[in-house]
Amino acid sequence: DKRMQSLATALYFITKSMDTTRPVSTNDGWENLDDTDVVSIHDYAYDDEEFDRKYIEADINTVSPVGRVQFVDGAKYRGQPILFTEFGGIAMQTDAKDGNWGYGVGASGAEEFYTRVKNLIRGIKRCPFQGYCFTQLTDVQQEVNGLLDSDHTPKFDLTGIGSFEIKHDGGFYEEKEL
């Protein structure tokens, strides 16, 4: 919607006129505009190989996470930091019922859940992003895709998550030997 794009652009410049020290994101997840200080992506890929195909092997200007364009007509990537602000979204199959859901096919158990989380994080770290945020920490209402359930009980042994360390080298995240 061109009106919404115009509104987002106007708000970007109004915000910048009031405070030039802070980055402004005009849209989070997809349909980014030229007037933005960061490019953000939401993508609930099933596995890390999908991240490779979309974000290492392809042009960021042409990717379509979750069926949405990454940039609106005429806008393009101009070297801004890229933040992967939502990925993961894994539900346990036993929880994804009665109106509750996650993204894609649910994990069959705690071991598969852990393995998929680990592989997605490793995949993200291979991509040329400056930051990422896993979706999500806890289950929230009908979204049962958290690392913890709604009572904050872990869905798997979380002690291994600390081993997913990041080594920063030249703008790319590299996997550290586990």
Whereabouts are the PLM-identified features?
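Catalytic metal-binding/acid-base residues of hydrolase active sites
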Residues: D1, T20, G29-W30, Y44-A45, ...
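Active-site neighborhood of glycoside hydrolase catalytic domains
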Residues: D1-V38, G79
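Short, charged low-complexity intrinsically disordered segments located at boundaries
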Residues: R3-M4, A8, H42-Y46, S150-P154
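Substrate-binding clefts and catalytic carboxylate motifs of secreted carbohydrate-active enzymes
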Residues: F13, D52, I56-L178
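A cross-family glycoside hydrolase active-site/sugar-binding cleft signature
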Residues: S25-N27, H42, T85-E86, T135
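Short, well-ordered secondary-structure micro-motifs within conserved domains or adaptor modules
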Residues: L33-A45, E49-R53
